[in-house]
Amino acid sequence: MPAALHRRSWVPAASEDHVLAIAADAAARDAAGVAAEVERLVADSHRIHDVDGLNLNPATNVMNPAAEALLSRGLGSRPSLGYPGDKYEMGLEAIERIEVVAAELAAEVFGARFAEVRVSSGALSNLYVFMATCQPGDTIIAPPPAIGGHVTHHAAGAAGLYGLKTVPAPVDADGYSVDVVALAKLAREVKPKLITIGGSLNLFPHPVPAIREVADSVGAKVLFDAAHLSGMVAGKAWPQPLEDGAHAITMSTYKSLGGPAGGLIVSNDAALMERIDAIAYPGLTANSDAGRTAALARGLLDWKVHGTAYAAAMRDTAQALARALDALGLPVFAKARGFTQSHQFALEAARWGGGQRAAKQLARGGLLACGIGLPIAPVDGDINGLRLGVPEIVRLGFTPEDMPQLAGWIARALAGDAPAVAAEVRERRTRLNGLRYIVR
């Protein structure tokens, strides 16, 4: 039978050709064939990520197997509307306790008084805060893509879809953050309701106390987007945003935090969290995935017990890899500042034709990464940086002592020796044994 999906004129032609070919293949199979194909694809993904490759993408991680197992225990299809102790549906005595345990662990780990665990993604976490602090038509100030500002803070993402006007924050290129002096001037001019900080690449601590002073001067709130920094914050290897003045922290729970896919909001501001609570229920979340909440609770327990050691290991390993790449002559961004103080850093990617081209070359060598924007000269037709991170490989057992070898693989793969590198990476994976920094 022909595919039910039709061509979408607004999608790039090459992507849509690929989509329709997959759809046609699925439509041509009987039920058993589709089931077999899904199983094959799941196994293939496992091979790519867990057998043949090493993930240097800081936007991903591996979960504690005990947490991951909770995703398939039948909780996810049980709707859970309302407050614990007064649920709309019956039979939720256990699930409501799981919700409270997850929130309590989040509050403990992030030094917060309040936690919203029902959010299904980091992007929606941002939207909840936008809605709780702003009205459509209001102005916000957010980091631009040149310093890792995320699309959800801008016109094409949640902020724009909610009707907010985003003004890019002025850039401190050397610090890969915002220029606070220029920010104060801009805030006086545009009168934002919200100032956001944090993004898809974070190298050095952001000046949150100074940003809070700017926000207070114009009556704005401060949102710290810890989508990528969540593990560093949880492990106390990074300044604590709530202590420094942020009104709320949003995050994804599956990146450096190493939990299930989803979002999380923490705050010490009761009035703000009251509004966010109403947005979550009965507003936009309604039924949440209780299986994800259980997995999140189990994952947060890892941070309560091992977080300090894990975050420090990520920082030390990222710094060691950056130094090793620099020693091989690769252009590591922010060399004058010591490359990074977090779990991630970037290469200037012009010599390889851009960050995405470089990432594709690395992937041929079994090393998975992606491009990122940097406040340097642009690259025609591509992103000008290549983002690298270590959360997953540290959890797999890699240490700073392993980084010269990994740097050599990266350099060789980028120089065209990807097939040989892929074989060496695959062999190294066979010698990995279990995960570190987890509660078993």
Curated annotation (Swiss-Prot):
Activity regulation summary: In the alpha-methyl-L-serine synthesis reaction, activity is inhibited by an excess amount of formaldehyde (at a concentration greater than 4 mM). Formaldehyde release activity is reduced by the sulfhydryl reagent N-ethylmaleimide, iodoacetate amide and iodoacetic acid, but not by dithiothreitol and 2-mercaptoethanol. Activity is enhanced by 1 mM of manganese chloride.
Cofactor: pyridoxal 5'-phosphate
One GO cellular component term: cytoplasm
Reaction equations catalysed: 2-methyl-L-serine = formaldehyde + L-alanine; 2-ethyl-L-serine = (2S)-2-aminobutanoate + formaldehyde
pH dependence: Optimum pH is 7.4-8.0 with alpha-methyl-L-serine as substrate.
N6-(pyridoxal phosphate)lysine modifications at: K255
GO molecular function: glycine hydroxymethyltransferase activity; lyase activity; pyridoxal phosphate binding
Enzyme Commission numbers on file: 4.1.2.-
Keywords recorded for this protein, A-Z: Lyase, Pyridoxal phosphate
GO BP: any one term: tetrahydrofolate interconversion
One Pfam family per UniProt: SHMT
Temperature-dependent activity: Optimum temperature is 50 degrees Celsius with alpha-methyl-L-serine as substrate.
Coiled coil ranges: none
Described function: Catalyzes the reversible interconversion of alpha-methyl-L-serine to L-alanine and formaldehyde. Can also catalyze the synthesis of alpha-ethyl-L-serine from L-2-aminobutyric acid and formaldehyde. Also shows low alanine racemase activity. Cannot use alpha-methyl-D-serine, L-serine, D-serine, (S)-2-amino-1-propanol, (R)-2-amino-1-propanol, (S)-alpha-hydroxymethyltyrosine, (R)-alpha-hydroxymethyltyrosine, alpha-iso-butyl-DL-serine, alpha-iso-propyl-DL-serine or alpha-benzyl-DL-serine. Cannot use D-alanine instead of L-alanine as the substrate for alpha-methyl-L-serine synthesis.
Family: Belongs to the SHMT family. Alpha-methylserine aldolase subfamily.
Quaternary structure (record): Homodimer.
Protein's name in the database: Alpha-methylserine aldolase
Source species: Variovorax paradoxus
